[in-house]
Amino acid sequence: FSMCEHHMLPFWGKVHIAYIPKGKVLGLSKLARVAEMYARRLQVQERLTRQIASAIERSIQPLGVAVVVDCCHMCMVMRG
């Protein structure tokens, strides 16, 4: 989970990561570690998605990378 920087309430969900390797191949634990590293910060979902994709792009320079983040935000759930 992560914390919404606007409301200081948690949001949680799933992160889907896909990439086309160009030489280097990352293990599943490395992808999870990248997602967790950025999720620990005060975040908004859009920036979290961009940061994960950018980190993978910078570190292994794949032919392509896609990141989809699907979350439930408590700031929206509490409003009803």
Curated annotation (Swiss-Prot):
Keyword Cytoplasm tagged: no
A Pfam family of this chain: GTP_cyclohydroI
Entry-linked InterPro entries: GTP-CH-I_C/QueF, GTP_CycHdrlase_I, GTP_CycHdrlase_I_CS, GTP_CycHdrlase_I_dom
Enzyme class: hydrolase
Record bears the keyword Coiled coil: no
Pathway: Cofactor biosynthesis; 7,8-dihydroneopterin triphosphate biosynthesis; 7,8-dihydroneopterin triphosphate from GTP: step 1/1
Signal peptide span: none
Gene Ontology annotations for the cellular component aspect, listed alphabetically: cytoplasm
Catalytic activity: GTP + H2O = 7,8-dihydroneopterin 3'-triphosphate + formate + H(+)
Gene Ontology terms: biological process: tetrahydrobiopterin biosynthetic process; tetrahydrofolate biosynthetic process
Subunit structure: Toroid-shaped homodecamer, composed of two pentamers of five dimers.
Family from the record: Belongs to the GTP cyclohydrolase I family.
This protein's name: GTP cyclohydrolase 1
Species this chain originates from: Euglena gracilis
